[in-house]
Amino acid sequence: MSNRPRLSLHIPEPVARPGDLPNFSRYAIPDAGALRRPEVQTPEHELRDLPYSLIRVLNGEGQAVGPWNPRLSPDALRRGLSTMLLTRAFDERLFRAHRQGKTSFYMKSTGEEAYAVAQSMVLEDGDMCFPTYRVLGWLMARGYPLVDLVNQIFSNAKDPLKGRQLPILYSARNYGFYSLSGNVGSRFGHAVGWAMASAYKGDDKIALAYIGEGTTAEGDFHEALTFASVYRAPSILCVTNNQWAISSFAGIAGADETTFAAKALAYGIPGLRVDGNDFLAVWAATQWAGERARSNLGATLIEIFTYRAAGHSTSDDPTKYRPADEAVHWPLGDPVERLKQHLIALGEWDEERHAALIAELDEVVKSAVKEGEAVGTLGKSKPSVKEMFEGVFKEPDWRVIEQRREMGI
């Protein structure tokens, strides 16, 4: 008879469930400014310590410290703060619109505004973002018309996508924002392919893509990294580790064993892990990765270490699977508050101006929502049926012609 122990299956479990005290002590958070910043041209094999630490710039006193400090101008910092506040104001008002029956679905970016806004500001015109549904800040930073967002969310007659997408699956090619897809694993593959095409044409444009940490368990993630590595695709591939894939905690995707940034090592590409609630740290990491991509040094995988402070969507109640006050205990704080405190520490901001800006942006959002409501909310106004046949085929084939005839169009 064997003395071997019986095999047992390991099932990862979160540290805290509803009713428990939130606990993030498992995460080692280094001091701001502690991590070295290597030169952009540094070979990948000399960068293998970076995925196991955390790039941080803003300390607890609101000061920007260390080698990753991008030394942004006060104007750039204020623009970043304003865009983050606009994103949050828009989220709050459109979330309420869902509760009022004006839209069928909505998803908020609460707690994750910093990385989308910073990365949108770093990338250049002509670069392409392959987004997930929590990077509304990218469009806000590019000046996308708020009323166009509202019209799509309300699914009304002026929906710029003519009812072809879910309310929050935006598409804005002219703003460097590729069509959002509910098939979240596809983002990396599309971005790598786009970046390879840019390199093949001898262009100077790069791609940036997002997936959530849960999606790293899908095959698309690994296939994209293989192509990115082999062909040195000029791309920045971001894993937004916000701790929760709907109700599945990050450990289900492997966070208990290693970092998501460390997954880059197997493919021979650099991996960075960045404080996703630190606007300056995200800016610096993205700038570094962008310089590598534009220098024909290939892709970089960035783990954006952050926290989803709201529910997954309007269809989700996070209190069913995590402590109700878990967001308050997140050790990296609120990205808006941290950037505000940095500006105050610089003498470039104060609480009065902050309150005035919040009120001003709320009025801007309110005006856009009213304009959309005048066109129509859910079920009150919708695109014409004939528009489902337009903008799809350059030349309609016989099936489309027959379908139009059957509908009397």
Model-derived regions: residue spans:
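Cofactor-binding active-site loop characterized by glycine-rich and histidine/acidic residues
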Residues: A89-E92, R96-A233, F249-D256, A261, ...
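A broad, low-specificity signal marking well-ordered, structured residues that form hydrophobic/aromatic
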Residues: I55, I168, T300
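A general structural signal for short secondary-structure junctions and capping/turn motifs
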Residues: E46-R48, Q119-V122, A228, E291-R294
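Conserved acidic/glycine
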Residues: M1-Y115, A310, T319, A324-I409
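Short secondary-structure boundary/hinge segments and terminal tails
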Residues: Y115, M140, I246, V282, ...
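Glycine-rich ThDP/TPP pyrophosphate-binding loop and its adjacent helix/strand module
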Residues: G176-A374
